[in-house]
């Protein structure tokens, strides 16, 4: 593993990576603060606010952890020991899984919230925050149980050079695995992620069906005077579809780039592009929430008004 060739010579790649992380950290901090305050301040707190707060907090920690890992990538020489390597890389892998779990839970909860009263999903509408927290915790524990092998595979290689190790940072690398172990872990990971993404896709498809039915009923009842304004249900459904599209596109791109990287001996550029693409959803999704929810804008306006009046 020649570490001189691992570091990208293009400074623009470094600037792009840290710019994305900075923007994402700022946006998720704002989103987390807004939804946490709205959850505790409003008379009827919505469980979906807690779920979005979970998602933004997970993405915030994911981007911060990635920032620490990226800092070690661009150093001249690695300084981390094996404990730091294993802790940060394992924590980062867990946060990526938690992000998927939180996004999946949000889509499902949104489906319950926007379902009509005649739907069989109505009974799930008014579940307490304890149920939301419990479901999120269950998904997280499930994800943790499949990622413990990283503690064995991650090693500190600040002073070692070998073509058999897979580069992670200047300090850390992954040990090679046998074909059978690689296939087993890959199958478990793909099964887990396909299951969660399928739940997101099913909930999104269900919402599209509901939106289509609602639109047909509205056209039938108000055929002569249709309103050009989108209803809250329509806006929420568009937000769900937009988030789902972003997630799937970035997930597929990240997977393609990862497999392209493994085919090249010096995959430094592919590695950096993979990191940028795989963290794009965590950077972009807060802006989708902020611009699609009028409550957030009203919340910040009222907060600014309080500050001015004090």
Swiss-Prot record:
Main location: membrane
Keywords: Cell membrane, Disulfide bond, G-protein coupled receptor, Glycoprotein, Membrane, Pheromone response, Receptor, Transducer, Transmembrane, Transmembrane helix
TM annotation in the entry: 20-40, 50-70, 94-114, 135-155, 194-214, 239-259, 269-289
Cysteine pairings via disulfide bonds: 85-172
Signal sequence region: none
Membrane topology value: Multi-pass membrane protein
Extracellular side: 1-19, 71-93, 156-193, 260-268
Tissue occurrence: Expressed in 1-4% of neurons of the vomeronasal organ. Only one pheromone receptor gene may be expressed in a particular neuron. Not expressed in the main olfactory epithelium.
GO BP annotations, alphabetical order: response to pheromone; sensory perception of chemical stimulus
Compartments where located: Cell membrane
GO molecular function: pheromone receptor activity
Glycosylation-annotated residues: 159
Pfam families for the chain: V1R
Keyword Signal: no
Record-level GO cellular component terms: plasma membrane
Cytoplasmic topological segments: 41-49, 115-134, 215-238, 290-310
PANTHER family for this protein: VOMERONASAL TYPE-1 RECEPTOR (PTHR24062)
Task of the protein: Putative pheromone receptor implicated in the regulation of social as well as reproductive behavior.
Similarity comment: family membership: Belongs to the G-protein coupled receptor 1 family.
Name by which UniProt lists this protein: Vomeronasal type-1 receptor 101
Encoding gene, per UniProt annotation: Vom1r101
């Amino acid at each position: 593993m020649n570490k001189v060739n691992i570091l990208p010579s293009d400074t623009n790649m470094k600037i792009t990576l840290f710019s994305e992380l900075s923007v994402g950290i700022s946006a998720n901090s704002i989103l987390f603060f807004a939804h946490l305050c709205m959850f505790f301040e409003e008379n009827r707190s919505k469980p979906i606010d807690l779920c979005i707060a979970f998602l933004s907090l997970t993405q915030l920690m994911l981007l911060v952890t990635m920032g620490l890992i990226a800092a070690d990538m661009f150093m001249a020489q690695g300084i981390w020991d094996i404990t730091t390597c294993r802790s940060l890389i394992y924590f980062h892998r867990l946060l990526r899984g938690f992000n998927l779990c939180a996004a999946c839970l949000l889509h499902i909860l949104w489906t319950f919230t926007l379902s009509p009263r005649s739907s069989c999903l109505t009974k799930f509408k008014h579940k307490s925050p304890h149920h939301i927290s419990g479901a999120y915790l269950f998904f997280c524990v499930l994800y943790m149980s499949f990622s413990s092998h990283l503690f064995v595979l991650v090693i500190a290689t600040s002073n070692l050079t070998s073509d058999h190790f897979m580069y992670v940072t200047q300090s850390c690398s992954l040990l090679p695995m046998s074909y059978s172990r690689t296939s087993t872990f890959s199958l478990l990971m793909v099964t887990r992620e396909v299951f969660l993404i399928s739940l997101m896709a099913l909930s999104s498809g269900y919402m599209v069906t509901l939106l289509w039915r609602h639109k047909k009923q509205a056209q039938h009842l108000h055929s002569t005077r249709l309103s050009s304004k989108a209803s809250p249900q329509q806006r929420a459904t568009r937000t769900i579809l937009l988030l789902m599209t972003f997630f799937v596109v970035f997930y597929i791109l990240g997977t393609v780039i990862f497999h392209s990287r493994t085919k090249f001996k010096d995959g430094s550029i592919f590695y950096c592009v993979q990191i940028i693409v795989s963290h794009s959803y965590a950077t972009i999704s807060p802006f989708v929430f902020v611009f699609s929810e009028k409550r957030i804008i009203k919340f910040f306006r009222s907060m600014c008004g309080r500050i001015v009046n004090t």
